[in-house]
Amino acid sequence: MLKFIKSIFKTPSDRIIANLKSKIQQVHSAESSLAKLSNIELRNKTNEFKARLANNEPIDNIQYEAFAVVREAAKRTIGIQHYDEQLIGGILLHQGKVIEMSTGEGKTLVATLPSYLNALIGKGVHVVTVNDYLAQRDSDWMGTIHRFLDITVGCITSNTNEHARKIAYNSDITYITNNELGFDFLRDNMQFTNQSKVQRGCNYAIIDEIDSILIDEARTPLIISGPVSDNTSLYPIINKLITKLNKDDYEMDEKLRNVTLTDSGINKLETMLAEINILAPNSNSLYDFENMHLIHYINQSLKAHTLFRRNVDYLVKNGKVIIIDEFTGRTMDSRRYSEGLHQALEAKEKVEIQNENQTLASITFQNYFRMYTKLSGMTGTAMTEATELKEIYDLDVVTVPTHNPVQRIDYNDEIYSTKKDKYSAIIQLIQECYSKGQPVLVGTVSIEKSEELSKLLHSKKIPHNVLNAKHHDKEASIIAQAGRIKAITIATNMAGRGTDIMLGGNAEMLVDQSNLTEEEYQEKLKITKMQIEQEKEQVINAGGLFVIGTERHESRRIDNQLRGRCGRQGDPGQTKFFLSLEDDLMRIFASDRVTKILRTIGLKDGEAIHHPLINRSLATAQQKIEAQNYEIRKNLLKYDNVMNDQRKVIYEQRNEAISSDNVNEILHNLTEELIVETVHKFIPPKSYKEDWNIHELLKEYHHIFNVKLQPASIEATSSSSEVIEYLTKTALDIYKQQEQDYSAKSANEAIKHIFIKTLDQTWKEHLYTLDHLKQGISLRAYGQKDPLNEYKREAFDLFKQMLLHLKYLFIQRVARLHIDLASSPKSTSSLLETSDNNLKGKIITENSMAHKYFGKISRNQLCPCNSGKKFKHCHGALK
C-alpha cells in the first residue's frame, strides 16, 4: 500500500530528479566532441572556461560542458566514468544542496564535478572530510583528475606544516578535515601579519559526511585554549572522598546526564572534609561562603565517577585521558573537557593532572560553515535531519536514486530480556555466517562493548578483527577487507565510514607496492583482482555482507548508516539489530509501561520477541532523543550567535589594523573618544565651572597619558568642549614627539603591535568572563527570567565594557611607548615579536608600567584605571 501511495504522490526529491534527468543529455551531447580531443586539447578547455568566466559569462552557462570535460578526464586518468546519477548529484551540489546518496554510490567521484566547475572562478574550493586518511586518499585519487585538467590540488592534514598549509589553501581545490579548517580560521585570527595567515577566505565548500560534521559535531565548539595556573592539588583529594560515597549519597539522572548529592552525601562529605582540614576554619558547612569553591571540585568529580565510563566516553592511553567521540567512536586527541571535568577524570584514573585551560578563541561549526558564500554536502543519511539542515544552514536535502536497485534485506529487530541472551544469539548468528563463508560486520556503540563481544568470539575460537578508537590506525585496511570470505569485523559506530566494503576484498589494499617494481606491482594486482572476483561470487552466493547491530543508537540516522554499510551498488546484503531490555536506550528512554508488558509476557531465557509495540516505543524514544539533541544544538547556536556577533567586530577591527599601513587614524579616533568620555565624567556638558572636578580629571589624564598638567591650564578654558580640544592637542603632541624620536615608520609598527596585543588580551579576558556568565545563566530561570535574554543583555554590557577597557589600555600603553632601537641592528618589525618574552626590552610591558605609574598596589585591590577589575586581572596581570 505504501509503495502504491508513493508511486502516485511523488516526493519533492522525485520531482527535482525528474527535472534534472532531461538536463543530463546536455552533458552527453557536450561529451561526444570531447572524446576526439588529445590530452593537451582537453586540458586546454580549462583555460577556455576561465577566459569565458573572466568575460563575465555566467558559470551556469558552462556547467554541462565542464561536467563533460571532467567525465572524459576521469575516464582517461583513473578509468572510471561518472554515470547519470552521479552527474545529477554533481548538479545538485553546484546548486548548493545536500545530496543523500547510498553507500558505495561514488560520492567521492561526484564531488569532482562541482569542485572543478567552481575552481575555475579562482577563489578556491574546499572539499571537507571527517579524517586525515580520507582527505589524503581523496586528494591523491580524485586529484589525479583535477591535475590532468591543470587544476592545482592541495591537501591539509593534522601533520601539515604552516608553509605547506598556505600553499594548499592557495590551490584551486583543497582537501581538508573540518577540524583543521576551523582551527586554521581561529589561528589566522591570532596572527600579527597577513603574511602569517594561511587561509584566503570562505568561497565554496563541499562537505563529505555532512550530517556527521554539521549535526553530530555541532554541539562541540572548536576552542583554542591556553593553560591557566589554577591549583590542581584538590582534584586527587576530592576524588579520594568521592570514592567513599555509596549510591544513597547521590541522585543520578541518566536522561539529562546530571548527578546531585543527597543530604546524606553532603553530610558525609562535610565530615570527611572537616577531618582533613579542607573546610575553612570555624566552618562546618560545605555551603558556607568560604567553602563554595569546593562544590565545583565535588560536582565534577561526582560526574567523572558516575556519568563517564572508561572505554565508552574516554580511554586512557600513554598516561592521558582521551575523549572518545560518541558518534564516530574515534578518539579526539586534541580536545579536553572544560570546567575541570577533564582534571576530575585524570584524578579518577590516577594519571598526571594537567592545568585547566582558558579559552583564547572559539567558534562552532554552525557559525564557521555559515560564513561560506556557497555550501553543499553529501551523505548516505540526511533525510532524517532535513529540517535541521534547512532551519540552521538553509540547505535543502535531495535524495539521489541508486544506480542499481538495492538488494539489501533488513530483518526485524530481535529483542531479548537480558544482554547475555542477546549476545548468545549474536554469537550463534555469527557462527552460522562463518560456517558458510558469509562476511559479517558487527556494529557496537562503544569500545567496551566491542571488546566484550571480542572476548566471546575468542572463547568460541572464531577469528575476527576489532576496529575501535584503540586501533584507529588500521581503520581503512580493516574495513576495506571486511567483505572477504569468513571475515568477521567488530566496529564501533561509524568506524571506517568513508571506506567502501567491497565483497571479496579490496585488491589495491591487499597488494603491498613498497618492494615491487611498477611492472611487478601491476602483475600481482592483476592476479589478486582475479582471485577477488572468484571470492566475490562465493560471498554473493552466501548472501553478501551481513551487518549486525548490537543495540539501537540514540539517533535513527546512525542506525541507518550502519545498515548502509552493506548492499553497495546493487550487491546483496542483510541487516539485523539485536536488542535487550538492559540496553541503555531501552533502560533509560523506553517507557516503563513497555518494560512492564514484556516482564508480564515472561520472556524465557534465550527467547526473542518481535512486537510492534516495542518497535514503536523504540522509534518514539529515538525521536524524543533526536528532538532533545536538536534543541541542545539550537540553544547552543543561539548563545554562540551572541558571541559570534562580537567575534565579527573584534576580528574585523583586528584585520583592519593588520592590513593598515598607518594606524594613526585608529589611534587618533580612540584617543578623541576616550578624552571626550573622560572629560564628560568630571566636567559634564553645560555644567557650571565651579562644579568642575579639575583635580580628578588631571589625575585621570595623568594615569592615561603619563603627563602632569597644571590646573591653571584647564581653568583658562570656558567650556567642556574647550577642555576636550586642549587635552586632545596635548595627547596628539605626545604621538608627534614619538614619531620624531623613533621615526614615523618605527612608531607606526610599534603602535600597530600594541593595538593587536591589547585587543587580543582584552578579547581573551572577555571570553573568560562570558564562559563564567554562561555557566550560571540558566539559574535566572528560577527568577522568572529568560536565561537567553539575560545572557544577551549582560554579554552586550560586558562587550561595551571590554571595548572601553581596550581603548584605555591601548592609549595608556602607546603614551608610555619606548622602542629600544639601539638594542639590535634589526628592523623595528623584527623587534616586535608576538611573544611577551621577546616584547620585553623592545616595548615597555604593561606589568612594569602599572607598578611605575600606579605605585604599590595590592593585587586584590580594584585597579586604579577604573575598569572595575581587580589589579591582578588588569594592569597588574602577570605577563
Swiss-Prot record:
EC class name: translocase
Entries under Pfam families matching the protein: P-loop_SecA, SEC-C, SecA_DEAD, SecA_PP_bind, SecA_SW
InterPro entries for this protein: Helicase_ATP-bd (IPR014001), Helicase_C-like (IPR001650), P-loop_NTPase (IPR027417), SEC_C_motif (IPR004027), SecA (IPR000185), SecA_CS (IPR020937), SecA_DEAD (IPR011115), SecA_motor_DEAD (IPR014018)
Reaction equation(s) it catalyzes: ATP + H2O + cellular proteinSide 1 = ADP + phosphate + cellular proteinSide 2
Subcellular location: Cell inner membrane; Cytoplasm
Binding residues for ATP: Q86, G104, E105, G106, K107, T108, D500
GO BP annotations listed: intracellular protein transmembrane transport; protein import; protein targeting; protein transport by the Sec complex
Alphabetical UniProt keywords: ATP-binding, Cell inner membrane, Cell membrane, Cytoplasm, Membrane, Metal-binding, Nucleotide-binding, Protein transport, Translocase, Translocation, Transport, Zinc
Cofactor requirement: Zn(2+)
GO cellular component, one term: cytosol
Topology of this chain in the membrane: Peripheral membrane protein
UniProt binding sites for Zn(2+): C863, C865, C874, H875
Entry keyword Endoplasmic reticulum: no
Family per similarity comment: Belongs to the SecA family.
HAMAP family, per database record: SecA
Name the UniProt record assigns to this protein: Protein translocase subunit SecA
Source organism phylogeny: Bacteria, Pseudomonadati, Pseudomonadota, Alphaproteobacteria, Rickettsiales
